[in-house]
Swiss-Prot record:
It catalyses: N(2)-succinyl-L-ornithine + 2-oxoglutarate = N-succinyl-L-glutamate 5-semialdehyde + L-glutamate. InterPro entries: Ac/SucOrn_transaminase_bac, AcOrn/SuccOrn_fam, Aminotrans_3, Aminotrans_3_PPA_site, Class-III_PLP-dep_AT, PyrdxlP-dep_Trfase, PyrdxlP-dep_Trfase_major, PyrdxlP-dep_Trfase_small. Keywords: Aminotransferase, Arginine metabolism, Pyridoxal phosphate, Transferase. Pathway: Amino-acid degradation; L-arginine degradation via AST pathway; L-glutamate and succinate from L-arginine: step 3/5. Transmembrane segments: none annotated. Pfam families: Aminotran_3. The modification N6-(pyridoxal phosphate)lysine is found at residue 252. One of its GO terms (molecular function) is identical protein binding. GO terms for biological process: alpha-amino acid biosynthetic process; arginine catabolic process to glutamate; arginine catabolic process to succinate; ornithine catabolic process. PANTHER family: AMINOTRANSFERASE CLASS III, SUCCINYLORNITHINE TRANSAMINASE. This is Succinylornithine transaminase. Its cofactor is pyridoxal 5'-phosphate. The keyword Thylakoid does not apply.
């Protein structure tokens, strides 16, 4: 018999680094979830841009079950067929020539930063170790990646931090140019700052970073953990901008809910990562790569990408209608199905309260700081689910505006 558990048990048993919602989801199908009490929710959070094909997608379940009936794990002393097939699919679909598999976005970014430092050290010298990142970015929670993230709130308690990491203002080429020099080994940037407020980069900004990296022989790293695998209406956001990085990191949606991460790069850069320079126990395991291979098959099609663009338009139209009614947002921004509603000054700091009210109304949304409500729904969310979910979101906005909202 299974142990009966409640939300209160989290506070009793778990390390308190999160404050989960007061309900526990127990079942999902497509873009809908149900909690322990049977209440239904439309899911516009998508596990923070992870569940790209919704919950319990039949093709992903089939891929997982098929591999689970074969074998689960061997370790990095052996390779496996699903990992090799997935690597080839990623290479064929992108600029990359080499792939490193891991288990998360943080691990992918850690590998990217280590590669950049080693490449510079091997080809130029140990003095070329500087990393330029951007304020309010997010690249993970390892000590290296949280230091690159540019949000002191996440890193200030863990000093001393890795040295030679400096932060420029996002979308400010002059600020970046002042920091990038011949001692810079890498520039790491999100094409859309997700945690930082759903802020898309300008094309000129990314083009300028590409030119600066070329001039100073630094590697350009695109952190596409959140923007990747169809989220922006292209398989990867670099395709939207027409700016090709030297290294790309991907995770989240790549596994459709099953943990996986990957670092993509060229043969020249990958060549410095010789046996023993880096590694992972679970990375590239057959369960994760079998599921991810099926995710890529489904998402990397013109039909799916066109569908993302159409759904983007549907969200924007309905969110604008909501804003006409309530006047709560100063801006609605983002690419594809990564969207952010920026709160007006009078509602500043209330994004979390709106998310809580939305859950009470039966729709799950995210926040990106205190002033931005974030949406990252499944890429195949239906028109009916968009309409129903945003009707529920409108109810949450109405409650907040009329003072009917309550903290909790």
């Amino acid at each position: 018999m299974s142990l009966s558990v409640t939300r209160e048990n989290f506070d009793e048993w778990m390390v308190p680094v999160y404050v989960p919602a007061p309900f526990i989801p127990v079942r999902g199908e497509g873009s809908r979830l149900w909690d322990q009490q049977g209440k239904e929710y439309i899911d516009f959070a998508g596990g923070i841009a992870v569940n790209a094909l919704g919950h319990a997608h039949p093709a992903l379940r089939e891929a997982l079950n098929e591999q689970a009936n074969r074998f689960w794990h061997t370790g990095n002393g052996y390779t496996n067929e699903p990992a090799l097939r997935l690597a080839k699919k990623l290479i064929d679909a992108t600029f990359a020539e080499r792939v490193f598999f891991c288990n998360s976005g943080a691990e992918a970014n850690e590998a990217a930063l280590k590669l950049a430092r080693k490449y510079a050290h091997d080809r130029v010298g140990n003095h070329k170790s500087g990393i330029v990142a951007f304020k309010n970015a997010f690249h993970g929670r390892t000590l290296f990646t949280v230091s690159a993230g540019g949000q002191p709130t996440y890193s200030q308690d863990f000093a001393p931090l890795p040295p030679d990491i400096r932060h420029a203002a996002y979308n400010d080429l002059n600020s970046a140019s002042a920091l990038i020099d011949d001692n810079t080994c890498a520039v790491i940037v999100e094409p859309v700052q997700g945690e930082g407020g759903v802020i898309p980069a300008t094309k000129a900004f990314l083009q300028g970073l590409r030119e600066l990296c070329d001039r100073h022989q630094a590697l350009l790293i695109f952190d596409e953990v959140q923007t990747g695998v169809g989220r922006t209406g292209e398989l990867y956001a670099y395709m939207h901008y027409g700016v090709t990085p030297d290294i790309l990191t991907t995770a989240k949606a790549l596994g459709g809910g099953f943990p996986i991460g990957a670092m993509l790069t060229t043969q020249d850069y990958a060549s410095v990562m010789t046996p023993g320079t880096h590694g992972t126990t679970y990375g590239g395991n057959p369960l994760a790569t079998a599921v991810a291979g099926k995710v890529l098959d489904i998402i990397n099609t013109p039909e799916m990408q066109n569908g993302v663009r159409q759904r983007h338009d549907a969200f924007i139209e309905r969110l604008n209608t909501i804003n006409v009614r309530f006047g709560m947002f100063s801006e609605i921004r983002g690419l594809g199905l990564l969207l952010g509603c920026v709160l007006q000054t009078e509602f500043a700091g209330k994004a979390k309260l709106i998310a809580q009210e939305a859950a009470k109304a039966g729709v799950m949304v995210l926040i990106a700081g205190g002033d931005v409500v974030r949406f990252a729904p499944a890429l195949n969310v239906s028109d009916e689910e968009i309409a129903t979910g945003l009707d529920r979101f409108a109810l949450a906005c109405e409650r907040l505006q009329t003072g009917g909202a309550s903290c909790g």
